[in-house]
Every structure is written in C-alpha cells, then in structure tokens.
Swiss-Prot record:
It holds the Pfam family TCTP. InterPro entries: Mss4-like_sf, Mss4/transl-control_tumour, TCTP, Translation_control_tumour_CS, Translational_control_tumour_p. The gene is tpt1. One of its GO terms (cellular component) is cytoplasm. It comes from the Eukaryota. The lineage of its organism: Eukaryota, Metazoa, Chordata, Craniata, Vertebrata. Belongs to the TCTP family. It is found in: Cytoplasm. GO terms for molecular function: calcium ion binding. Residues 1-171 form the TCTP domain. Its main location: cytoplasm. Gene3D superfamilies: Metal Binding Protein, Guanine Nucleotide Exchange Factor, Chain A (2.170.150.10). Involved in calcium binding and microtubule stabilization. Keywords: Calcium, Cytoplasm. This is Translationally-controlled tumor protein homolog.
Amino acid sequence: MIIYKDIITGDEMFSDIYKIKESENGMMLEVEGKMITRAEGDIDDALIGGNASAEVADEGCDSTSVSGVDIVLNHKLQETSYDKKSYTAYIKDYMKAVKAKLQESAPNRVDPFMANAPAEVKKILGNIKNFQFFTGESMNPDGMIGLLDFREDGVTPYMIFFKDGLEIEKC
C-alpha cells in the first residue's frame, strides 16, 4: 500500500486504495472517494473472544454512526473553512513552503511547480464556493489543504491535492 503524506506536516492525506488521477499538467492529484456510513463504538464479540454468558444480560455499549466521505473518515482529515481572501493568503505561504521543500528534495521540480502553480490556484479560486477544505489530522495551518468537491452527478465526491506537496510512503 502507498500512503500519500503532506511534506510539511507529515500528516497522512490519502492512500492508493482510491482511484487517483493526475491532472494534465501533472500539478494536481484528483482522488475519487465514496459517501459511507460506519458504526463507531460498536464492539464486535468476535474481537473479545470467549463465550457470551447465557445467564447474564449483555450490557453492550453505545454505538453511533458517522457518515461522510471515505477519504476524510479513513485518514482523519479535519474540516476547516476559507473564503477567497483567506485562501489566497494561505496559498501564497503554502507555495513558498513547498518551493523550499522541493529545493531540498527535488530541485528539478521547482521550476515546473512555480510555472504551473498560478494557473491551478486561479482554477481553484474561480471555483472556491464549491469546495470544502480539509487539513491533515494535526490541523497544522501551514500544511496542505485538501479540496473536496462533487462530480456533476452530485453524488460522487473527489478531493484535489497538490502533487508536489505530497511525499510517498510505501507500507
């Protein structure tokens, strides 16, 4: 399995269990998810082991169900909010941080990143009202923000991430 992590915070953003598509210019990764509902807090008897007593009533435990996009739930992404002005301020600082990381780790990616990033940011800002914003589990404001939107069918969620802001870890 391959896990994609934020190069700034080290937060897990997504893995290769999803359908991943690279943008035409190679700047963005589009990750397709699904809407899911899962029970939380429910303990499966098979995990406990032993036999359930027939004499004593099972006290059980409270369980709740959580619904959302599988990418967000599985990787513990945290929702945050931005408007056009605040996202513009964030993305300027983020681009500088990614550029600095690229200069250390992949100097050959700096020029393509700086050349293509403004066009991607312009696309994002033009569509900003449709996006939901998610940080990694640490909620570090300097880290990557994943952008969640839905396809034209209104049902299929997908997230967009800057490819150069991710590091790949094989498990």
